């Protein structure tokens, strides 16, 4: 257990660990208990009743948050010809093909997301061992392997976030910055929560959403009562 600083311990006193808070109150507490001296990221963590070892209980995808994450993401598009032109017009930060694959092989990583057209995936596969461990490998499930490169770039720039269940059955997703209005964070939270409910694997048994927590970077976690979240039917 890491040693906590004085500011963290003081902030943690404001939170009742035995209580699950209404989502708005939880987010207000996260803002109040932020101990970072910068505009910290607010993250939601879901503990799910799934067995990620089973192929039919894997959860992975992406969703556009209505208010973005507050982070500018640099997009590399691997495409040729007309698709490369479309990516440039859409505002991709870098556009190319094997030239950028060679750069990545040499240790270049000045980007946050890769979008690739399906015809480029044979080449991209050559650097799979480099991209995979960093979570940068393009994937059709997250909309990053597509011929509609303009749409992919626009969605990423608009605040698209990826989610993926880890080995312990948890999903962590950023929903904005502590400087965001509470309402915007609540709406971003509701969007990702609604998405997680929609992608419940048919094979999952028992309670699906076991626990939901929100926290800021370096701040204490606050338990959320999911029943207080307004979810569209």
From Swiss-Prot:
One of its GO terms (molecular function) is tRNA binding. Keywords: Repressor, Ribonucleoprotein, Ribosomal protein, RNA-binding, rRNA-binding, Translation regulation, tRNA-binding. SUPFAM superfamilies: Ribosomal protein L1. One of its GO terms (biological process) is translation. One of its GO terms (cellular component) is large ribosomal subunit. It holds the Pfam family Ribosomal_L1. PROSITE patterns: RIBOSOMAL_L1. InterPro entries: Ribosom_uL1_bac-type, Ribosomal_uL1, Ribosomal_uL1-like, Ribosomal_uL1/biogenesis, Ribosomal_uL1_3-a/b-sand, Ribosomal_uL1_CS. Part of the 50S ribosomal subunit. Binds directly to 23S rRNA. The L1 stalk is quite mobile in the ribosome, and is involved in E site tRNA release. Protein L1 is also a translational repressor protein, it controls the translation of the L11 operon by binding to its mRNA. Belongs to the universal ribosomal protein uL1 family. This is Large ribosomal subunit protein uL1. The lineage of its organism: Bacteria, Bacillati, Bacillota, Bacilli, Bacillales. The gene is rplA.
């Amino acid at each position: 257990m890491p040693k906590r600083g004085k500011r963290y311990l003081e902030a943690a006193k404001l939170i009742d660990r035995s209580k699950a808070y209404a989502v708005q109150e939880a987010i207000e507490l996260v803002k109040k208990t932020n101990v970072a001296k910068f505009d910290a990221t607010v993250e939601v963590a879901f503990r799910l009743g799934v067995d990620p070892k089973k192929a039919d209980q894997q959860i992975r995808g992406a969703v556009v948050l209505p208010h973005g994450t507050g982070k500018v993401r640099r997009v590399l598009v691997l495409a040729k010809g007309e698709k490369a032109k479309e990516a440039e017009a859409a505002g991709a930060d870098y556009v190319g093909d094997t030239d950028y694959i060679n750069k990545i092989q040499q240790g270049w990583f000045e980007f946050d997301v890769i979008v690739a057209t399906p015809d480029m995936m044979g080449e991209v596969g050559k650097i799979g061992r480099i991209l995979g461990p960093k979570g940068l490998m393009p994937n059709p499930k997250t909309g990053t392997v597509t011929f509609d490169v303009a749409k992919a770039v626009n969605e990423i720039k608009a605040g698209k976030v990826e989610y993926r269940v880890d080995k312990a059955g948890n999903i962590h997703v950023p929903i904005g910055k502590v400087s965001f209005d509470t309402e915007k964070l609540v709406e971003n939270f509701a969007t990702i929560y609604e998405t997680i409910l929609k992608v419940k694997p048919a094979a999952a048994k028992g309670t699906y959403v076991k626990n939901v927590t929100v926290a800021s970077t370096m701040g204490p976690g606050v338990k959320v009562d999911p029943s207080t979240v307004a979810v569209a039917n």
